[in-house]
């Protein structure tokens, strides 16, 4: 198959674990692993699928930064949109101020996805909640 993967990891421990797994499975020719913060990485390649599983407070930044790398009929998937069920709670129910701020950011991202006319986004209760945003091709 011609499938290739580019993945970005900023946590050194996770990066080294991924590197070990890629070598163990002999997938070095198919998986490119980048050790960096994704917001500091510039990619020129185009992708059919982009998967965002990163700092939840920055999901809009990740989406806007990497959508230029998405093929015209591509899809962006975002993980952990329920954030351990906290997104479904009223703000007053969340004791930590930092968690409230993070939940607010996730809710802003969900609104961003719902309002983005360039994508058809569906939300699923799978795991901790995911969104699947399919780019609407221009005619």
Where are each of the predicted segments found?
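S-adenosylmethionine/decaboxylated-SAM
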Residues: 1-139
């Amino acid at each position: 198959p011609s499938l290739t993967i580019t993945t970005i990891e900023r946590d050194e421990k996770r990066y080294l674990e991924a590197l070990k797994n890629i070598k163990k499975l002999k997938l070095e020719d198919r998986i490119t692993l980048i050790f960096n913060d994704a917001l500091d990485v510039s990619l020129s390649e185009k992708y059919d699928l982009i998967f965002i599983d990163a700092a939840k407070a920055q999901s809009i930044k990740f989406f806007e930064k990497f959508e230029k790398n998405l093929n015209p009929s591509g899809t962006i998937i975002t993980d952990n949109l329920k954030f351990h069920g906290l997104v479904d709670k009223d703000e007053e129910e969340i004791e930590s101020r930092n968690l409230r701020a993070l939940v607010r950011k996730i809710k802003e991202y969900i609104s961003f996805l719902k309002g983005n006319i360039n994508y058809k986004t569906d939300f699923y209760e799978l795991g901790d909640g995911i969104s699947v945003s399919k780019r609407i091709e221009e005619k």
